[in-house]
Amino acid sequence: MRRAFVERNTNETKISVAIALDKAPLPEESNFIDELITSKHANQKGEQVIQVDTGIGFLDHMYHALAKHAGWSLRLYSRGDLIIDDHHTAEDTAIALGIAFKQAMGNFAGVKRFGHAYCPLDEALSRSVVDLSGRPYAVIDLGLKREKVGELSCEMIPHLLYSFSVAAGITLHVTCLYGSNDHHRAESAFKSLAVAMRAATSLTGSSEVPSTKGVL
């Protein structure tokens, strides 16, 4: 099963994240997170379990959308220094999620590797292209104009996607092509990334690593 559990604790944030890429049961050591979750929105149980509570509602919403449409089960709990601002929480949760994703993927054998998707949300349309390359790189262009969406700074949205790509060791190109509402622009971007990730991580039935180098 492609799954992982990661704890990442610093003086700024304390984070626990569990991921199962194929809706498999989440690692048992993450069960305690269920009792900590206070978010009512990003909390669903069933075949696909998604429980996210970062202390920032819109960030929970984005991680929920990412997991939902990528086909992941996900538990993510964070408490950070929000008394300062949202920077450390947004950045560090993305790092922890990227580490967990990389661990769950293993050596990347037997996956499609590349994925792309367009996703709309009403008037907004976003495109994401993913390469599970082992080489972290991110080009993010969302064109957000507001200072914040909810309690999440708009400047942190591209930064957290960059942080995720670095920790996961993957290449991301995420672009919002157009849209007049920043909530819609951001959410369509996360949904397009999710669908692209789902394609890139899909299994081909081969045992080979999809690279001429033989490793990723």
UniProtKB/Swiss-Prot annotation:
CDD domains found in the cross-reference section: IGPD
SUPFAM superfamilies registered for this protein in UniProt: Ribosomal protein S5 domain 2-like
Annotated PROSITE patterns: IGP_DEHYDRATASE_1, IGP_DEHYDRATASE_2
GO cellular component: cytosol; nucleus
Phosphoserine PTM sites in chain numbering: 211
UniProt cross-references to Gene3D superfamilies, sorted A to Z: Imidazole glycerol phosphate dehydratase, domain 1 (3.30.230.40)
One GO MF term attached to the UniProt entry: imidazoleglycerol-phosphate dehydratase activity
Transmembrane residue ranges: none
Keyword Lyase attributed: yes
Pfam families, A to Z: IGPD
Enzyme Commission code: 4.2.1.19
Enzyme class: lyase
Sorted UniProt keywords: Amino-acid biosynthesis, Histidine biosynthesis, Lyase, Phosphoprotein
Catalytically driven reaction(s): D-erythro-1-(imidazol-4-yl)glycerol 3-phosphate = 3-(imidazol-4-yl)-2-oxopropyl phosphate + H2O
Pathway connected to this protein: Amino-acid biosynthesis; L-histidine biosynthesis; L-histidine from 5-phospho-alpha-D-ribose 1-diphosphate: step 6/9
GO annotation (BP), single: L-histidine biosynthetic process
PANTHER family, A to Z: IMIDAZOLEGLYCEROL-PHOSPHATE DEHYDRATASE, IMIDAZOLEGLYCEROL-PHOSPHATE DEHYDRATASE HIS7
Protein family per UniProt: Belongs to the imidazoleglycerol-phosphate dehydratase family.
Protein name: Imidazoleglycerol-phosphate dehydratase
Biological source species: Schizosaccharomyces pombe (strain 972 / ATCC 24843)
Upper classification of the organism: Eukaryota, Fungi, Dikarya, Ascomycota, Taphrinomycotina
